[in-house]
Amino acid sequence: MNEIRNIESDPIYRNRLANMLVDRILKNGKKSLAYQIFYQAMKRIRQKTNRNPLSVLRQAVRGVTPDVVTETKRVGGSTYRVPIEVVPAKGKALAIRWLLIACRKRSGRSMALRLSDELIDAARNSGSAIRKKEETHKVAEANKAFAHFR
């Protein structure tokens, strides 16, 4: 059976959620660069909002975490999008993935600036990641009739 890997906490904030985000920022094994981007984004969040950046991060992830997603099921030659409730760990992972996809799609500037802007927007219940969650919920709502295929 799949074992859930133990997630360490990051060195400065001592927070698992922060480390999950850093692990997803990571590209080509450059973890020190990923930490640098994350800490610059956190510093900018503190400057822009005058709030604890970790609380902004938690609020952003909580806001983007989906309640339901759709899974594709094939039944008798037809394909259905079946709505399924999300397990909290998977929801958090999806939220982090969507936040990073949204900030990578933002135009120009450095990754730290885009990440901080996206996290602030998500904490305020706006931004691309929030739209992705709402879109996912709409698709699940539209396919509610197929819930019995679970």
Swiss-Prot record:
Pfam family, one: Ribosomal_S7
Cross-referenced InterPro entries: Ribosomal_uS7, Ribosomal_uS7_bac/org-type, Ribosomal_uS7_CS, Ribosomal_uS7_dom, Ribosomal_uS7_dom_sf
GO molecular function terms attached to this record: rRNA binding; structural constituent of ribosome
PROSITE patterns in the cross-refs: RIBOSOMAL_S7 (PS00052)
Location (main, coarse): plastid
Gene3D superfamilies linked to this entry: Ribosomal protein S7 domain (1.10.455.10)
Record flagged with keyword Transcription regulation: no
Location in or out of the cell: Plastid, Chloroplast
Protease in keyword set: no
Gene Ontology terms: biological process: translation
Keywords, alphabetical: Chloroplast, Plastid, Ribonucleoprotein, Ribosomal protein, RNA-binding, rRNA-binding
Description of how the protein assembles with itself and partners: Part of the 30S ribosomal subunit.
Function as written in the Swiss-Prot or TrEMBL entry: One of the primary rRNA binding proteins, it binds directly to 16S rRNA where it nucleates assembly of the head domain of the 30S subunit.
Membership in a protein family: Belongs to the universal ribosomal protein uS7 family.
NCBIfam families on file: rpsG_bact
Protein name per its UniProtKB record: Small ribosomal subunit protein uS7cz/uS7cy
Organism: Adiantum capillus-veneris (Maidenhair fern)
Lineage: Eukaryota, Viridiplantae, Streptophyta, Embryophyta, Tracheophyta
